[in-house]
Amino acid sequence: MNYLKTIGSFALLLAVAGCNPNGPDPGKGKIDPKYEGLVLNEIAAHEETQEFDTWVEVCNASDQPRELDGLGLYITDQFFKGQKIADLSGTLAPGERKVFSTADETLVTGFSSADPFTLVLGTDKDIVADSFECKADDPSLGYFASYQRLPDASGEWRLVTYSSQGKVNELFDLSKTRPTAVWAWGSHMSDLLANDGAKLKELKAKGYDHLLLNYSAFDYPTNKPLAKRLIPMCDELGIAVHAWLQAFYDGDWVSPIDDAKKAFKEEIFERIRTDAARYIEQWGVKGIHLDYIRFGGTAYKHNYTQEVNSINAVNRACREVRETCDAFEEGIVTSAALMPEANSSEYYGQVPSQMAKYIHILMPMIYRYGSYNMSDNTFKSNSNYFAERAAAGGGVSWSGIQTYDANTKGLSAEKLRRDIDLMAETNASGIVLFRYQLGTFPDVNDLWN
């Protein structure tokens, strides 16, 4: 068979029938009132890889039911010109949305955000309901990013680093979550994912809404496949994943101050900013958590000028991470781990009230067992100290709680709940448990509702 001749003959038949063989033209297409209000609402253009699907969400933004029969999705890119890649059918109620995906083959091929493309919702008779154009200079999508209309179904298009497939398009809002978090290592992901995420689902059911996931989950090659499974599962459950990065530590303490030059080490601050941006862009995390955002007990040895000193080094890193997160305009949250001693800036360079000018959530590690051996009163007093300093700087404090005793034996749910209740009696706005896989986590659904 002469394939080219057959294609040419088919195109001629379409033209005679009043059909456009190149699909509807978004610049010239007509509008049919029966499709009014049907819009392309969200697009994840990940080509057609083994790990990530391409999908398109169509939404009915009108106040009337709309028939989809006769509509299709048409792609024009470096490979196709007006190629139909989906046949639509059925009815969408007002506000209802439907996803077409390569995962279930309702979308017959993927397309990539790395190259220009135009997607049209329309018919082969030049009826255009809506269209979207990805231009050559537009940034490509990260693993979990998508192009979205914001506000949902009516606003302008923008790239968002996390998607909302099948849900209302909206930016992350910390106030809509519970102030309950867990620190987890990259090595914990296998356990969290086992049995279809049974333990992850249990965490959510018990009232924990945030997961502070160590940088190794994103950076270690053996962990990346697990992170690619864990993050969408967390999104589906309503658990916000924060990337937990190490600021002034890389297997050993890394001073952000060059003592010989009495100047900041610019490469340290650049690395922190770059890592934060990379975790957001590539992984779609909802927060950046700074650990080791301090000196290892020797801050007083690095104070040289009014500008170059340990406190300013810590504050600068906090400020630059906040600026990096805010630049995305996606509600990305900043948090930081603090040492639990009051008035300890001489040793760590941490001044909570100053850090809270840039950090949304201070997370003091108020670990009562072991070397600190805190009484109930000291435990609560330390929590109040950080809560008050956080508030003075415009932030909040979630008290970090140890889930194991002095012998690294996990606490029972009853004992851990007692410590949590003590923190709930203070001015702390939430809790963070250290760490996953140690201790039995109690139900906390009754707290901070």
Please report, for each region that a protein language model flagged, where it lies by residue.
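Intrinsically disordered, low-complexity linkers and terminal tails enriched in Ser/Thr/Pro/Gly
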Residues: 19-176
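Boundary/entry segment of secreted carbohydrate-active catalytic domains
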Residues: 173-199, 203, 336-340, 402-404, ...
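Aromatic-lined carbohydrate-recognition surfaces of secreted/lumenal glycan-active proteins
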Residues: 181-185, 242-246, 311-349, 394-405
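Active-site-adjacent "subsite" loops/lids of carbohydrate-active enzymes
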Residues: 182, 190-192, 226-232, 240-283
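Catalytic domains of carbohydrate-active enzymes, especially glycoside hydrolases
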Residues: 194-219, 282-287, 361-362, 426-430
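Active-site groove signature of glycoside hydrolases
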Residues: 212, 271-308, 432
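Substrate-binding cleft/loops of secretory-pathway carbohydrate-active enzymes
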Residues: 333-374, 408-411
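Substrate-binding cleft of secreted/luminal carbohydrate-active enzymes
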Residues: 364-379, 386, 393-449
